[in-house]
Amino acid sequence: MFRFDKEQMVIDFAGAKFGGQPGEYPTALSGTIFYARHKIVEDAKKGIFDKKAAEALINKQAEMQDITGNSALVQVFGGTEEALVNYIDFVSEVWEGPMLLDSTSGKARMAAAKRATEAGYAKQCIYNSINVSIDEEEFQSLAESDVEASIVLCFDPMDPSVEGKLNVLNNGGKTKDVGMLDLAEKAGIKYPLIDVAVTPMGAGAGNAVRASFAVKAKLGLAVGSGIHNVPSAWDWLREFRKGLREEGKEQIAKDVHHVCDIGANIVQTMASGDFVLYGPIDNAELAFPAVAMTDMIIAETAKELGTTPAAVHPLNKLI
């Protein structure tokens, strides 16, 4: 593999440790819980869910962390203020590691950061996210909270190029008059996690992968993405699976999506990724072995370059 000349930031947060040079620390893996239509959710607006099933999923991911050495993160999604607050209160009771505060609603994200601060578990939380769409109200809410970690999205809708992604981090690019990294610093963020914002294939997916190298080479920050979304937005794959189902090949239709879904995480890992948002937490037993194997290959090749894998690295645990 390779080593970056730039000194690389290591994220040491809420018991998780990732980042650094390729092959140094294993990739952190974040599974999403309470996502849209998640079968364990009984009322998505109020945040009512099967607590036993939720705890089992979180524990299974934690077990995979113990087995492979890859740090586990829990991405908590809630569509409303009430739901997200209920969810994160529960997760904080059963999980001591990092959790992402995630919602399509800015109000819900703000409520979650406020609740985490008041309840004393903000040091576990990763805000998702600081991006060009953040408004003054949400920024001030984040700044007033005790949250110290955040996903920072390097996406400029006016310039999806690699240069555009770097510019939006440094100076706001063509969309904002301030860089996302400056915003993060002003909000009190000590642990910025750079999401390279993978778009569908044919619309810039390759730029995001290349941006992973660029961000680490130029800024030395931890990078990653939710690259598993690429197969879901792939029209050809959707039609191919439809054809398989019409031929009565239901299981293969399911399997081919799983292969592409989990395989996408390998792409991000090979592209010097430090963390991967791998999708449904239900897939922990698929995602962790695949990424751990990739990490092992990277670490083995990086040894000749002077990179020593951490004691908890899969290369030291799974052979």
Swiss-Prot record:
<keyword id="KW-0554">One-carbon metabolism</keyword>
<dbReference type="InterPro" id="IPR023467">
    <property type="entry name" value="MeTrfase_MtrH/MtxH"/>
</dbReference>
<comment type="subunit">
    <text>The complex is composed of 8 subunits; MtrA, MtrB, MtrC, MtrD, MtrE, MtrF, MtrG and MtrH.</text>
</comment>
<dbReference type="InterPro" id="IPR028342">
    <property type="entry name" value="MtrH"/>
</dbReference>
<dbReference type="InterPro" id="IPR011005">
    <property type="entry name" value="Dihydropteroate_synth-like_sf"/>
</dbReference>
<comment type="pathway">
    <text>One-carbon metabolism; methanogenesis from CO(2); methyl-coenzyme M from 5,10-methylene-5,6,7,8-tetrahydromethanopterin: step 2/2.</text>
</comment>
<keyword id="KW-0808">Transferase</keyword>
<keyword id="KW-0484">Methanogenesis</keyword>
<protein>
    <recommendedName>
        <fullName>Tetrahydromethanopterin S-methyltransferase subunit H</fullName>
        <ecNumber>7.2.1.4</ecNumber>
    </recommendedName>
</protein>
<keyword id="KW-1278">Translocase</keyword>
<dbReference type="GO" id="GO:0019386">
    <property type="term" value="P:methanogenesis, from carbon dioxide"/>
</dbReference>
<dbReference type="GO" id="GO:0030269">
    <property type="term" value="F:tetrahydromethanopterin S-methyltransferase activity"/>
</dbReference>
<dbReference type="Pfam" id="PF02007">
    <property type="entry name" value="MtrH"/>
</dbReference>
<dbReference type="GO" id="GO:0006730">
    <property type="term" value="P:one-carbon metabolic process"/>
</dbReference>
<comment type="similarity">
    <text>Belongs to the MtrH family.</text>
</comment>
<dbReference type="GO" id="GO:0032259">
    <property type="term" value="P:methylation"/>
</dbReference>
<keyword id="KW-0489">Methyltransferase</keyword>
<comment type="function">
    <text>Part of a complex that catalyzes the formation of methyl-coenzyme M and tetrahydromethanopterin from coenzyme M and methyl-tetrahydromethanopterin. This is an energy-conserving, sodium-ion translocating step. MtrH catalyzes the transfer of the methyl group from methyl-tetrahydromethanopterin to the corrinoid prosthetic group of MtrA.</text>
</comment>
